[in-house]
A protein has these predicted regions:
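Bacterial lipoprotein signal-peptidase II cleavage site
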Residues: 19-36
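Short, polar/charged alpha-helical segment
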Residues: 47-52, 63-85, 99, 159, ...
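Extracytoplasmic ligand-binding site segments that recognize negatively charged/polar headgroups
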Residues: 63-70, 92-93, 105-245
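A ligand-binding cleft/hinge motif common to bilobed small-molecule-binding domains
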Residues: 116-120, 242, 247-265, 315
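Short beta-strand->loop
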Residues: 127-136, 149-150, 178, 264-276, ...
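Periplasmic-binding protein-like
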Residues: 140, 155, 219-223, 230-231, ...
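Mature extracytoplasmic/periplasmic domains
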Residues: 280, 285-342
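Conserved C-terminal helix/tail region of periplasmic/extracytoplasmic solute-binding proteins
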Residues: 340-369
Length: 369
């Protein structure tokens, strides 16, 4: 059946400050008011298919957030003759691996994961600049001004609640981020380590911006009292909740999470005091063995409505319409009222300082295996 996400994406006006905002003090992001939206412009129809491929060969090695994207890459392989190898890896792990490889990446293309890691990789000189004609159709707020990364959609964050455990524990489901601090949830909340999960890094940085630095860190210190552990994978919270191990998981929300409602006794909660969100990135690695194939894949993806519709089907979300407003065949199904106002420039600029402070906060609750 048709699933409905709450639309929590305030078109482009809520993120128009991306390029203009500057970083605040280390580890203490300061929100910047969103700019007034610009008048609507009649979009130019987008092409249905990508431009003809250049002469490509060899293998395109991809690191992606999961293996469900193979359908998209199989289409690319069929149209170009390039073989594709895909390795599933979280955005934080990709960034750590990139830095460890010292400028000689073992992969060519980075597909998916929180944009904070892509911003940091650009600053470290680890990404390849990509330029193509159709990039002008992409919203400025969701692409790097210099062409080092592009966003393929947005991920939103909420709670997945185990109804059975709620009944057994005689507790009610949390409705807000503030509710998570109630003592009744002690030891019943699972969250992914924000150092490896772009989704949960979005939670941390967005809440720091919402509450302010000192109050924000006070919040996470209090929340830590109720956290059972911080998982190494972004999927850990939902996996532990559907396995009846914990009552509440702080998790990304998309069609795959909504499908769980038909299989398990769980519910989705969209916290009414604000929804954190994070753009998902795409980039080519600098000095990659097959960087030309990686660069063409990015052009191939964003130049074709057909390819973007396939991506939306795989992701089970319509937020790619925000990335490419003239995309045909997809309409947003989102109510944007309670999306948190975020300054994305702080996500990359303060990533290291924020994660260092959060690592100290987690202590031995961070799972490393």
């Amino acid at each position: 059946m048709k699933k409905k996400l709450l639309s929590l994406l305030l078109a482009l006006s809520m993120v128009a400050a991306l390029a203009a905002c500057s970083a605040g003090g280390a580890g203490t992001p300061t929100p910047t008011p969103a700019a007034e939206p610009t008048p609507a412009v009649e979009p130019t129809p987008a092409p249905e298919t990508a431009p003809a491929a250049p002469a490509l060969s060899g293998t395109l090695k991809v690191v992606a957030t999961n293996e469900t994207y193979m359908t998209l890459f199989e289409k690319f392989a069929a149209e170009t003759g390039v073989k594709v190898e895909l390795l599933s890896m979280s955005s934080g792990d990709v960034l750590s691996k990139l830095r460890a490889e010292g400028g000689t990446p073992s992969a060519d293309l980075w597909f998916g994961g929180g944009i904070d890691a892509f911003m940091s990789a650009k600053d470290d000189g680890l990404l390849e600049q990509v330029s193509f004609a159709a990039s002008s159709d992409l919203a400025d707020a969701f692409k790097d001004a210099d062409g080092y990364w592009f966003s393929k959609g947005l991920t939103i964050v909420g709670f997945l609640v185990n109804n059975t455990l709620m009944g057994e524990l005689n507790i009610t489901a949390p409705a807000t981020w503030t509710d998570l601090l109630n003592s009744e949830y002690k030891g019943e909340i699972v969250m992914s380590n924000p150092a490896v999960s772009g989704t949960n890094y979005a939670v941390v940085n967005a809440m720091l911006q919402k509450l302010g630095g000192e109050a924000g860190w006070d919040y996470f210190n209090s929340l830590n009292e109720n956290i059972a552990f911080y998982g190494k994978r972004g999927s850990d919270p939902k996996n532990k909740v559907i396995a009846d191990e914990y009552a509440v998981g702080i998790t990304y929300i998309d069609g795959t999470i909504e499908d769980l409602l038909d299989e398990y006794d769980v519910s989705i909660v969209y916290p009414t005091d604000g929804i954190p969100w994070m753009p998902d990135g795409v980039a080519a690695f600098k000095n990659a063995d097959n960087v030309e194939a990686a660069k063409y894949f990015i052009e191939w993806l964003f130049s074709s409505d057909e390819n973007l519709r396939l991506l939306a089907e795989i992701d089970q979300k319509t937020s790619v319409k925000l990335i490419k407003p003239n995309l045909e065949g997809i309409e947003l199904d989102y109510d944007t009222a309670i999306l948190l106002d975020e300054d994305l420039s702080l996500f990359g600029a303060q990533r290291t300082a924020v994660l260092e402070q959060f690592e100290a906060l987690m202590g031995d609750k961070a799972v490393n295996d």
